[in-house]
Amino acid sequence: MSATLIIALHGTRHRRGVEFADELRAAVSAAAPGVPVEIGWVDIHDELLAETVQRFERSVIVPAFLAAGYHVDHDVEEAVAQSGGRAVATPHVGPELVRAIADRLLAAGPLGDAVVLAAIGSSRPGANAEVLATAERLSELVERPVGTGFIYASQPTLAQAVEQLNADGHHDLTVATHALAPGLYLDHIAALGLRAVAEPIGIHPHLVSAIVSRYRAATPAEAS
């Protein structure tokens, strides 16, 4: 039997965020016939990733995170360490999803003269640096200046990002959402009162493809 593909997600109390997880599991299952697919939460839920891993003889954890913050560096690695050799983890999916962010941004309507990339933020500088690199690539794709604003744990904040873009002469701003699923963070974005806000990535073909390709790379014998 194929190794179980465990999609590692943050965890949420937001109804739409939970629905996203169910939809993502279904989409990945459809893209990888014959592969058992499960969700493993790293926070908030009663059963966390390290416990989920224990239920399977072999598993591949694919961290569905846009940056390698604490949960990727600590929780995922801890789940692997506690698995007794039954689980491995792949790199997180974030680096492959800039075009998905751009797609959602363009779907939000005509772009203004600049973009605010709204990101959750991390206590890990390396994770925030990944977000800044994403902003640079997004700017190249949409041919607009992109300023980054963090919602939690880091600076510049969303408000500071807007202020800086305004100071640079950009007043018609569109928000790109650096997140996979809806969550409580949306209230912080709405508080900006900007004209257009892009949806989070959601069930995007690039996300599904990134998850499946990482699983296949970790199980080459089964893919052959």
Regions from the PLM with identified roles:
Residues 1-224:
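Active-site-proximal alpha-helix that buttresses catalytic centers in soluble enzyme cores
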